[in-house]
Amino acid sequence: MGEITIEAAGRAVRFTSPDKVLFPDRGWTKLDVAEHYLRCAPGAVRATLRRPCSLKRWPNGVGADFFFTKRAPSTLREAVAVRFPSARPGRMAIVRDVSDIVDQVQLGVIDLNPWPSRAPDTDHPDELRLDLDPTPGFGFDDCREVAGACRALLAERGLEGWPKTSGSRGIHVYARIHPHWTFHEVRRAALAFAREIERRLPGLATTEWWKEERRGVFIDFNQNARDKTIAAAYSLRHTGLVSAPFGWNEVGTIDPEEMTLEGFRDRWSAVGDLTDGIDDHPGDLGGLLAMADADEAAGLGDAPWPPHYPKQPGEPPRVQPSKRRSDNG
């Protein structure tokens, strides 16, 4: 089958090579990926609506290389102006309805990778993102405990956490915020949050940026920097697992390995969109920024930024500790 037309949100979308296998071990096709997003459209659109999207493209499936397209291809009907970390302007893909997600799948996208800000104001995030990533020797059960601590601390600071499986080994917890703060301020709040969780769960949670020093569940505060993305809720990942929202009453029982394309189809039929309501009560970031003020007053400065970002004022050396020791030799 060379080309079909998919009806999505009242629009006819041209879709080529629908029977192309993107998951060789499972036999899932390009059309299977599109149908997944059509099935869970209310949640997938809610997660990406008006957000600039990096296009992570797997043109030859998950058994081959992928590449990122940051600037929106001219074939897409929707794009939004943004500023990249270099301060250069650009235009990125954006989702208005599920037909725009199908357009992304047509380009070889499997998982959706939106910014935490929305058009028209893409400079001020409306989402705080907590990415809990277990290091070797730790696993999903450890992420459950850290996620529970994150929920409690968010509530203490007037924010509501919304958890989901990452589609890999970890958990993501999102909190909606008013779009009043810059990316720098949101990242600063995320770093203070992560450090407080590390204090509450010593030996289990970690904020160590350098992998050689990490032990435990890493809270990746840098995911809140401009142009960083995390797979959106309801994304099908290259692992073959869906990044599945769950209720806090499930934090002790949710099994990420059950969230395959087929398993998630049954879950969606049973529970529907568990992110319904996430946009209803955005919170204030002031409580977390007060924690950042206290950390800095106590002598805790910034942490390293990702390597491709411009050097930041007050940032420590962006060199891994073992390399520094070797150089000082």
Describe the predicted segments one by one.
Residues Y174-R188:
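Catalytic palm subdomain of template-directed nucleic-acid polymerases
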Residues W115-A119, L159-T165:
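Catalytic micro-motifs at enzyme active sites that drive phosphoryl/nucleotidyl and oxygen chemistry
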Residues H36, F140-L159, V186-L201:
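Long, well-ordered alpha-helical scaffolding segments within enzyme catalytic domains
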